[in-house]
Amino acid sequence: MRSEGSPISISLGRYGVWRHETGLSPELAARIESLGFGTVWIGGSPPGDLALAESMLDATTSLTVATGIVNMWSTPADEVAPSYHRIAAKHPDRFLLGVGVGHPEATSDYTRPYATVVEYLDRLDELDVPVAGRALAALGPKVLDLARDRSAGAHPYLTTPDHTRTARERLGDGVLLAPEHKVVLDTDPEAARAVGRPRVQQPYLGLRNYRNNLARLGWATGDMDDGGSDALIDALVAHGTPEQVAARLDEHLAAGADHVCAQVLTADMQAPEKDLERLAGALGIA
């Protein structure tokens, strides 16, 4: 059964930007908003005070901010819930609390992960964080079911349109599906892989929950070892012209996503304003 709540009332738009918390700022959020993207996703494990999210909302007028994700192991529900309520009161319908259990290699305390997710969501219920105001990091079928029944929907990370298709079948209609996809705006495949491969290899190809998900999608162990095969890297990191990359993002929408968030990778790791501008033009949102 779905917990008490209503369908998501937050508008994410069709396209968003996913970026690690260390590379975000209120100024960049304002620029992203001006380019026509609907949502900024705060990557990493932002702390429970949600100060960065609040500062980006303060600096913008219509942009939605989502966490991708607050880690259940490091941030108790009792810590993040008051922050959620503070922001939701100040910026109604502009903040989505994305939460997740992370991965077992990240903490020595990683035990009973599924039960931990359930207990965390139970506590959010007790603290009046609405179902419609939260999303769940989800890859496998059991957690996708939780995302469907206990949150506004799922935020899968490091996936492909094939996963989006199967996730939509699992979630059914009317449930948010917002996958992340990495992109490099470079038409040279070797140069693009040189940027994308390290961001996939470390740490994700060494983490069993991501490897298990890729295996479910049909990728062989050999594709995941030694930095990832070219075919796997190309599937997980879209590259090419802005128009080619936009078409790859649209494959998620065609497969059933409501929203797709692009993680724009650059060789120098600097804020990718120029690439975001080019991508926004190709997506037709600028």
Q: Model segments located where?
A:
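Active-site-adjacent structural elements that line small-molecule/cofactor binding pockets in enzymes
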Residues: M1-A286
